[in-house]
Amino acid sequence: MSKEENIELTGTVIETLPNTMFRVELENGHQINAHISGRMRKHYIRILTGDKVKVEMTPYDLSKGRIVFREK
């Protein structure tokens, strides 16, 4: 799957779950479970409840996503 097929949305972290999973509320009101991308894990970027994040989602499963950027 190429990078162009992924859907990129913004949202807010509303809950921290075990195993570096987060519940994110998207701007359109939907809630999804998301995990941290490997690059964010490598650079020890911390994500807290209330942070604005960019989430990448695949069109095949719209209930899961990958956090790729934490906005300041």
Swiss-Prot record:
UniProt keyword list: Cytoplasm, Initiation factor, Protein biosynthesis, RNA-binding, rRNA-binding
The S1-like domain, residue ranges: 1-72
UniProt xrefs under InterPro entries: NA-bd_OB-fold, RNA-binding_domain_S1_IF1, S1_domain, TIF_IF1
Domain of life from the UniProt record: Bacteria
UniProt GO MF annotations: ribosome binding; rRNA binding; translation initiation factor activity
SUPFAM superfamilies recorded: Nucleic acid-binding proteins (SSF50249)
GO cellular component annotations of the record: cytosol
Compartments where located: Cytoplasm
Cysteine disulfide partners in this protein: none
Keyword Transcription regulation recorded: no
HAMAP family: IF_1
Known partners and oligomeric status: Component of the 30S ribosomal translation pre-initiation complex which assembles on the 30S ribosome in the order IF-2 and IF-3, IF-1 and N-formylmethionyl-tRNA(fMet); mRNA recruitment can occur at any time during PIC assembly.
Cited function: One of the essential components for the initiation of protein synthesis. Stabilizes the binding of IF-2 and IF-3 on the 30S subunit to which N-formylmethionyl-tRNA(fMet) subsequently binds. Helps modulate mRNA selection, yielding the 30S pre-initiation complex (PIC). Upon addition of the 50S ribosomal subunit IF-1, IF-2 and IF-3 are released leaving the mature 70S translation initiation complex.
Similarity comment text for this entry: Belongs to the IF-1 family.
Protein name in the entry: Translation initiation factor IF-1
Organism the protein comes from: Dichelobacter nodosus (strain VCS1703A)
